[in-house]
């Protein structure tokens, strides 16, 4: 019985943690999903963004008490503007998506929403972490050795 409880806890922790991509695995996935050069944004910049926003973790969330919104997933897409979590006051849901969809191991929907974000005038500058850690920097290290 004790073994079953421990096994259950291990499986639950794996389910809660979600998928944490290896760097090159994510680079290949983003390239396959059309992110390299999308709206003039290099794959290395997308990788830098994902590193600093979520550390490549699909289940990352971050609550923002100021506007009562939450950032979701590998790109930390915000519930005030881009997705619907059913809790954020005045949410826009410009991606027309449930925020929970941004937490899936399959990042296809997260990529589609990130593409929607960068179509707005701010572009990739909508992400604070990108401005702080990636903008005007050599970001080639994020794809180095990945063959992409």
Curated annotation (Swiss-Prot):
Classification via InterPro entries: Glyco_hydro_22, Glyco_hydro_22_CS, Glyco_hydro_22_lys, Lysozyme-like_dom_sf
Domain of life: Eukaryota
Residues of the active site: 53, 71
One BP term from GO: defense response to Gram-negative bacterium
Disulfide pattern: 24-146, 48-134, 83-99, 95-113
A molecular function (GO) term: lysozyme activity
Keywords, sorted A to Z: Antimicrobial, Bacteriolytic enzyme, Disulfide bond, Glycosidase, Hydrolase, Secreted, Signal
Function, in words: Lysozymes have primarily a bacteriolytic function; those in tissues and body fluids are associated with the monocyte-macrophage system and enhance the activity of immunoagents.
Assembly and oligomerization: Monomer.
Protein name: Lysozyme C
Organism: Saimiri sciureus (Common squirrel monkey)
Gene: LYZ
């Amino acid at each position: 019985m004790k073994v079953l409880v421990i096994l259950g806890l291990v499986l639950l922790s794996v389910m809660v943690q979600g998928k944490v991509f290896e760097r090159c695995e994510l680079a290949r996935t983003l390239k396959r999903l059309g992110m390299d050069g999308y709206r003039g944004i290099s794959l290395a910049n997308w990788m830098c963004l994902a590193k600093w926003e979520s550390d490549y973790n699909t289940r990352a969330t971050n609550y923002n008490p100021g506007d009562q919104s939450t950032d979701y997933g590998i790109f930390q897409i915000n519930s005030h503007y881009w997705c619907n979590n059913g809790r954020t006051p005045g949410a826009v849901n410009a991606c027309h998506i449930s925020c929970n969809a941004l937490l899936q191991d399959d990042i296809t929907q997260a990529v589609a929403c990130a593409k929607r974000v960068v179509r707005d005038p701010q572009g990739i500058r909508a992400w604070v972490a990108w401005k702080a850690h990636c903008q005007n920097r050599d970001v080639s290290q994020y794809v180095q050795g990945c063959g992409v």
